[in-house]
Amino acid sequence: MPRTEEANQRIREERRGQILDAASRVFARKGLAGTRIADIATEGEMSQGLIFRYFASKEEVFAAVVEKALQSATSLAQAALQQPCSPLEKLRWLLQIYLPGMWYKPDYALVMLYALNSEDTPQEVRELALEQSKLTLQLYRQLIVEGQEAGEVVQGDPDMLTLAFAACIQGLSSSVLHLPRTLGVDGSPDPEIVLKILKA
């Protein structure tokens, strides 16, 4: 029996996701300039032709990986705001998901940081990254302000506290490939360490 359009769409989405996952690993190691479509195909154990069925160039793949990473970060912050708990518990919930995910599968986070900081990043991708990052920071700020109003987060300039919180998370993301081995660390960071920055 022929597959339904719904089944075909699901297969297309799965294959696209497989391409992006493989690409995220390669871009995290090699950057945009050092990556070829052939590298992504080898990493994902797929043909170059399959990749070109979904993307016209490696730049398109890179943009899609960055978009997925940014949307994941924003969606997590939005979900944290909706949790039925206190503001500090919302922040803890966010970190309990984000930190292990970033620690054990760091590729998307590393590509996101690369997109924000590398001169190789196409201008339109950089603008998308900056805009989406701004939205995520606004959500972090909202969580912090709620915490201040509840007396759970230290008083002070919420913009500076947001900066410190985001910088801590990004610092962990950027160091995940080398610092754990250097320090002999086993396991993802304890959310409580990050929360100490904010606790009243």
Where are each of the predicted segments found?
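Hydrophobic alpha-helical connector segments
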Residues: 64, 78-107, 161-165, 188
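Short coil/turn segments at alpha/beta junctions that flank glycine-rich nucleotide-binding fingerprints
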Residues: 29-33, 83-84, 105, 150
